[in-house]
């Protein structure tokens, strides 16, 4: 018998993420500066994962939902887990990350 544990954050695809980002939900990009500068989701705030892990509350919005993105969805899952552990209750991890965002043809900023 296996026991499934519920993750404290929601995994969403890039299509769902685009809708949420367009509605004004903040996006935190946890990639490294050189990755971010090569292209990122419009309006995304750069907070490299190591920086976020040192002081997650400092980088989270005071309330409301937040989206995390990286290149593929792994680093952002770590950040999402830490955000939830720090008290955030409406946390989304963008599966497929920036690579998936670009593959869909969604806009980026440099």
Show where each model-derived region lies:
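Short, surface-exposed ligand- or partner-binding patches at beta-edge/loop junctions that are enriched
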Residues: 68-69
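Rhodanese-like catalytic fold shared by cysteine-dependent sulfurtransferases
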Residues: 1-26, 33-65, 74-110
């Amino acid at each position: 018998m296996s026991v499934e544990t519920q993750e404290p954050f929601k995994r969403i695809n890039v299509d769902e993420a685009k809708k949420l980002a367009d509605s004004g939900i903040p996006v935190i990009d946890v990639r490294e500066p050189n990755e971010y500068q090569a292209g990122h989701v419009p309006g995304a705030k750069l907070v490299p994962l190591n920086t976020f892990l040192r002081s997650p509350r400092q980088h989270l919005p005071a309330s409301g939902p937040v989206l995390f993105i990286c290149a593929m969805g792994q680093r952002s899952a770590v950040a999402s887990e830490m955000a939830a552990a720090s008290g955030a209750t409406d946390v989304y991890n963008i599966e497929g990350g920036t690579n998936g965002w670009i593959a869909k043809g969604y806009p980026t900023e440099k």
